[in-house]
Amino acid sequence: MSSIEHVDVAVIGGGVIGCTMARELSRYKLDVCVLEAADDVGEGASKANSGVLYAGFHPRGGSLKGTSCVEGNAMYAHLAEELGVPYRRTGALYVAFHRAGIDKIYEKRERAVQNGLGELEVISGDEAREIEPRLSPHALAAMLAPTTGIVSPFQLVCALARNAAANGVQFHLGFEVESIERADGVWLLHARDGRCVRARFVANMAGEDAAILDAQVHPADIVVKPRRGQFIVFDKQAPENAIRHVLYQVQETDEGGTLLAPTVDGNLIAGPTSENVRSFRDSATSQVGIEHVRRVARKLVPDLDLGQVITEFAGVRANIVNIEKEQKDFVVRASASGFVSALGIKNPGITCAPALVKRAIEILGEEGLALASNPAFDASDQGAVHKRPFMQCSPEEQRRLLEADPTYGHVVCRCERITEGDVRACMRELVPPTTLDGVKRRLRCGMGRCQGAFCAPRVTGIMADELGVAISEVQKGALGGHLTCGEVK
């Protein structure tokens, strides 16, 4: 058995909840590590969502999901400023297309009050179109939720991880926890490859695997199954598709919670569907699912140009299935002595993350974890080599970067205007990417109109050089997939 040094707290999972937990724990005088099964952070549900920060009127009134949504939403302006992550408060319109839907709006309005959001304004369809001109003429009424916002989920997770690492947190990627045991007051976390971490306390934030791991230390009372959500993304160079607010419709019989939203990067996104699937690896899109998203998006904005869709994707989230829908909630609990679990965390998990982590740390404190302040803690994203891509820098910053490294003058991604210097800097950050998809999430190479047709081979070559491997060894994503098999000459 290969053993890693004893730590105070081991965080299982490197998604948004796990990385937020790691960063918050680094505020204290603690030895902390993150154990992530994939080869990069944010490889699970955190990478496959809309990036919407919900106001908090959807979840059941008074639930942990509802109250933490309101609390977490309120924490994001400060968090995004600290980390330098793109964030914008857009507001949302919850739209009714039928008389019964107006009754539903008032039900959600009461939930908002119960969750601590306050009383939201209900406006007529005409008033809604005054502030969102492209909204359907068939909309009868809408509830305005001004605190709804948007954030880049990819940049958020990476910035959280970098900041945690800069403050002393160790990241062990490719560490898939297989078994957990308790010995002499210490938790032993065994990986599939034989490695072992010894921790006084454990924060189980493993997303889809959290319930399985929790069942090793607590009676198996939470059953989690996979639920898939499909999305479509529109070209950001299509201003005719621009909208001002996040748009939801009051749910009808078969239309689920599909929304239409702007993104911080300028694209428009629509989705998700909500489908039970057999495996957490089933992140394929389907014709039926994508047609559903297109139909609902067009219902909200009838003149939406669907010819501007540049990609589609799906994510799979953890759905609790052994509790009645009306009683379902997020679960954050002490499952055993010194062992806290976050279970069944799905949408709006990103919004709730700061508040859920706050509760999890309180639980660890109640379990005996000493929370002495770390005077060296730095809240800024000092783990980044530089804060923004070259093309987003001021002329003075650009001159300085070019003098230090001429590769900043070599554009490798035309759609997103990313340079070779940006890619090389990204590869040298704390918690750097190891796959092409990892670079994509950090810099947006491959997220533009051409979807990597121009930049993929160029970025792959730069990665091979930085990693010191043959170009054929660079993988596309966490599940593998080589882009090349060798050189032709």
Labelled PLM ranges:
Residues 8-34:
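N-terminal Rossmann-like FAD-binding beta1-loop-alpha1 element of flavoenzymes
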Residues 20, 180-185, 189-271, 275-286, ...:
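Flavin-dependent oxidoreductases
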Residues 27-47:
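Glycine-rich FAD pyrophosphate-binding loop
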Residues 50-131, 257-258:
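Dinucleotide-binding Rossmann-like beta1-alpha1 core, especially the glycine-rich loop
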Residues 67-70, 98-104, 143-162, 283-288, ...:
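Short beta-strand to alpha-helix junction loop
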Residues 144-201:
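Helical element adjacent to the flavin cofactor pocket in flavoenzyme catalytic cores
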Residues 264-265, 276, 281-411, 418-429, ...:
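C-terminal catalytic lobe of FAD-dependent flavoproteins
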Residues 419-430, 453-471:
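Iron-sulfur (Fe-S) cluster-binding segments and ferredoxin-like electron-carrier domains
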